[in-house]
């Protein structure tokens, strides 16, 4: 398991970030890697919202940070986040996915969720440059329509 090389994705990419990072991202014209070897993206707005529902929207849930330390997600504050719709500029770097590593006896439901999670995010090894004027979605606007959001993030009861 672990990293697997993939083909360069075609078309638009999406990246969620805290608003406090937006000014420097727009000024630099790139998404910079953060304490990791990769920068992470999704193929659609729906994938972005689903990824967020499995990560930053999980207040109190445990996760391992880029340095391998166990952390807990803080309270999710929608006003603090935006999603960028990016048109990547030519890059010659390597694209990867990270396949979640599980013990052999993991339940099928855990395996299915790990498979979904692994394929929601696309990693780029390096800083990804993008063309000017990306579309910026306010998280509060995306979450305003509960029924639409539920269908976008594939929550099943």
Label every PLM stretch briefly.
Residues 20-37, 91-117:
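Surface-exposed flexible segments
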Residues 59-102:
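Charge-dense polyanion-binding interfaces
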Residues 153-157:
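Conserved small/polar residues in nucleotide/adenosyl-binding loops
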């Amino acid at each position: 398991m672990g990293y697997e090389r993939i083909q360069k994705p075609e078309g638009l990419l999406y990246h969620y970030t805290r608003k406090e990072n937006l000014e420097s991202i727009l000024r630099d014209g790139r998404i910079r890697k953060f304490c990791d070897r990769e920068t992470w993206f999704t193929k659609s707005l729906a994938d972005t919202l689903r990824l967020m529902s499995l990560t930053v929207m999980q207040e109190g849930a445990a996760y391992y940070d880029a340095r391998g330390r166990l952390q807990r997600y803080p309270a999710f504050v929608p006003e603090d986040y935006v999603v960028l719709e990016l048109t990547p500029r030519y890059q010659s770097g390597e694209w990867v996915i990270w396949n979640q590593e599980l013990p052999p006896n993991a339940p099928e439901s855990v395996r299915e969720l790990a498979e979904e999670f692994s394929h929601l995010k696309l990693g780029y090894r390096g800083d990804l440059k993008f063309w000017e004027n990306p579309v910026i979605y306010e998280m509060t606007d995306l979450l305003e329509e509960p029924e639409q959001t539920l269908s976008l993030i594939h929550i099943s009861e």
